[in-house]
Amino acid sequence: MPVSDFQVVLGLEVHAQLLTRSKIFCACPTEFGGAPNTHVCPVCLGLPGALPALNAAVVEMAIRTGLALGCEIQRRSVFARKNYFYPDLPKGYQISQYELPICSGGGVDIAVGGEARRIRLTRIHMEEDAGKNVHDVTAAGSGVDLNRAGVPLLEIVSEPDLRSIDEAIAYLKSLRAILMALGVNDGNLQEGSFRCDANVSVMPRGATRLGTRCELKNMNSFRFLRQAIDYEVRRQVELIESGGKVDQETRLFDPDRGETRSMRSKEEAHDYRYFPEPDLPPVLVDEALVERIRRELPELPRARSARYQRDLGLSAQDAELLVSDKGIGDFFDATLAAYGASPDAAKRIANLLNGDVARLANELSLEPAAWRIAPAQLAAILRLQDAQTIGGPGAKQVVEEVFRSGAEPAEVVREKGLAQVSDEGALEAAVDRVLAASAGEVERYRGGNKKLLGFFVGQVMKETRGKGNPAVVNALLKRKLGG
């Protein structure tokens, strides 16, 4: 049976680091990138006698996330010890939640191929992050950096409702956009503040019994997620087809080889010997707190996209791209306010943000907060076009230069000599040269092939190095060609 005869079944576990200033059970800072083992204390290090104290901001962020995702907020939840040994876990256990998580149920809405679906959530729970093993730092071997130990996490667990890689990526992008809009997570996959484990299984199409699942780790980009799941699905199908059996295990994705490899046998809950954390009381949530947080919820990506489509006439595709990152949506709103709101302006700004600006941001790996171009500058570029100071090709060059340097658009136009030529006398000479060099095309145009006008315009634009005003060039050509 080919792969297409099997149904892929996916469930995702997302670990989202919360944007708190201090860790979940102590006052150590959560900043990324400090020197190894400098953001630590006896609690982080798991020293005997050090007692945890819950950060109230973590609870509020968990409730905010649960409300945004339609979860039931549990009025009483309990922390538990998850016992396992690993060098980056100094206590020998992780403080997490098990039987009584803070949120249950809920879901994430996705759309793939024009079909809308709601992917159910099992639970959301609070837990502490582990440290980090650092390899190749000394000739003697590896080291352990515990700066990350105790950083607060939300683990968001989906039901096995996903049926394709495209659905899995759509789910992650939608969830990431929601968490960023809520201000609880920065969505950074590369730094590991938004990371995902995938439970992958296959079953023959038409079957009702789920196959044995494998958990995949080490996927810090959407591209790696696609590669890892695709490889794992093919591996499982080939194993089943050859008469083998899929073992329940944890597998690590190797991005250099594009394949997964066995890491360890998959543990069940009883292997972790969960029991209630004796050093922390139950988390009690009252109705007043929940209602306050509900009132303070910001506009979520789905509502923002609907507003852009309804009020500004944007296409669903443009709107979804703008709301995929809160920073991009905020930049769009600020540019629209600086330029003047109208459906035409919204479309032009969306085209720039989803086109040239997105390309540059990807090329330079920059998040919106690090862009050197400002909304007022993007609005100024549009006004330069309105005044016919620059044309489309010139605007593209100005956007790139301002994005890279932060220089003012008018200054870039002046220094780079990008001002559009609208003087008929200057353009007429270029038009005459093009027509003289294209006698055959001129004859065919006058014989009825009017589509050649675009060819002539293109040749004149080449002659003027993209600076000719297209409207003036068109008028001159039509006059000289006889309509």
Swiss-Prot record:
Sorted alphabetically, the Gene Ontology BP terms of this entry are:
glutaminyl-tRNAGln biosynthesis via transamidation; translation
Gene that produces this protein? gatB
The broad enzyme category this protein falls into is ligase
Family affiliation: Belongs to the GatB/GatE family. GatB subfamily.
One Pfam family here: GatB_N
Q: What is this protein called?
A: Aspartyl/glutamyl-tRNA(Asn/Gln) amidotransferase subunit B
Q: Tell whether GTP-binding is among the UniProt keywords.
A: no
Q: Which UniProt keywords apply?
A: ATP-binding, Ligase, Nucleotide-binding, Protein biosynthesis
The free-text function statement in the UniProt record for this protein reads: Allows the formation of correctly charged Asn-tRNA(Asn) or Gln-tRNA(Gln) through the transamidation of misacylated Asp-tRNA(Asn) or Glu-tRNA(Gln) in organisms which lack either or both of asparaginyl-tRNA or glutaminyl-tRNA synthetases. The reaction takes place in the presence of glutamine and ATP through an activated phospho-Asp-tRNA(Asn) or phospho-Glu-tRNA(Gln).
Which superkingdom, per the lineage? Bacteria
**PANTHER family tied to this protein:** GLUTAMYL-TRNA GLN AMIDOTRANSFERASE SUBUNIT B MITOCHONDRIAL AND PROKARYOTIC PET112-RELATED, GLUTAMYL-TRNA(GLN) AMIDOTRANSFERASE SUBUNIT B, MITOCHONDRIAL
Fetch the HAMAP family from UniProt: GatB
User: By its UniProt entry, which SMART domains does this protein fall under?
Assistant: GatB_Yqey
Q: Quaternary arrangement and interactors, per the entry?
A: Heterotrimer of A, B and C subunits.
Q: Known catalysed reaction(s)?
A: L-glutamyl-tRNA(Gln) + L-glutamine + ATP + H2O = L-glutaminyl-tRNA(Gln) + L-glutamate + ADP + phosphate + H(+); L-aspartyl-tRNA(Asn) + L-glutamine + ATP + H2O = L-asparaginyl-tRNA(Asn) + L-glutamate + ADP + phosphate + 2 H(+)
Q: Flavoprotein: is it a keyword of this entry?
A: no
Q: Which organism is it from?
A: Anaeromyxobacter sp. (strain Fw109-5)
EC number(s) in its UniProt entry?
6.3.5.-
Q: Which Gene3D superfamilies match?
A: 1.10.10.410, GatB domain, N-terminal subdomain
Name a GO molecular-function annotation. Answer: asparaginyl-tRNA synthase (glutamine-hydrolyzing) activity
Instruction: Specify the taxonomic lineage.
Output: Bacteria, Pseudomonadati, Myxococcota, Myxococcia, Myxococcales
